[in-house]
């Protein structure tokens, strides 16, 4: 069926499935493709080894949007990502190119495709207070508070997932509303304005994939992962 909608390509897959290699291969073969990273860690400067970020040489030869976009001392929420990615898609089409969104952050893909609810933006002051409470009371205390304010969210978030607990409490405190109510006022989903071409890399041999993941872990450690984390912790007091 023919469509007049401009195309947007999604390339999804788990860790160590070869997404970057596929994206670069497509760019070489078809041309006029601009790669947009859909990764919650590659977006940060300095998180190079831990995120298995493409090498500087690769990024120079095959530029990736939303890689090294911001620093760890800046908040770059999923809302920021969706807004930036949507703008990038428009700009790429204006250049008569095709956006190829590549990554493994399935939540980001889902929100781009189906629309982002109009949740309140992150509040640095409130976030700092919540982080201070974690230091004093422990994360379990905040998870218990979330259980009172929004049991559904609390049940879906592990008690050790600090970032998601903080965000859920931000939403509860800033809006005074349940996220499901806020979902009614959602942004325009990409699926309604673009022709989405979705491709997935899902290895059938799970054992081999796990071997590749384990091999990557050892390689990253040998490349200096521990030292990178220590350096980031020292620089940003993580």
Describe the residue ranges of each PLM region.
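Phosphate/pyrophosphate-binding catalytic cores of soluble transferases and nucleic-acid-acting enzymes
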Residues: 1-238
């Amino acid at each position: 069926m023919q469509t007049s909608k401009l195309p947007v390509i999604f390339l999804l897959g788990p860790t160590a499935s070869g997404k970057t290699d596929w994206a670069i291969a497509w760019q070489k073969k078809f041309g006029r493709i601009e790669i947009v990273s859909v990764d919650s860690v590659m977006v940060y400067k300095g998180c190079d080894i831990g995120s298995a970020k493409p090498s500087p040489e690769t990024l120079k030869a095959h530029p990736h949007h939303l890689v090294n976009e911001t620093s760890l001392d800046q908040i770059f929420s999923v809302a920021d990502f969706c807004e930036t990615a949507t703008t990038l898609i428009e700009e790429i089409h204006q250049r008569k190119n095709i956006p190829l969104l590549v990554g493994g952050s399935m939540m980001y893909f889902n929100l781009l495709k189906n629309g982002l609810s109009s949740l309140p933006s992150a509040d640095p002051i409130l976030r700092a207070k919540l982080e201070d409470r974690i230091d004093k009371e422990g994360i379990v205390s905040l998870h218990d508070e979330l259980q009172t304010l929004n049991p559904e969210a609390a049940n879906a978030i592990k008690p050790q997932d600090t970032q998601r607990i903080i965000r859920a409490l931000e939403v509860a405190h800033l809006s005074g509303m349940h996220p499901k109510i806020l979902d009614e006022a959602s942004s325009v989903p990409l699926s309604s304005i673009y022709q989405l071409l979705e491709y997935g890399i899902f290895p059938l041999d799970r054992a081999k994939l796990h071997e590749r993941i384990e091999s990557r872990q050892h390689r990253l450690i040998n490349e200096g992962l521990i030292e990178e984390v220590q350096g980031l912790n020292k620089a940003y007091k993580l």
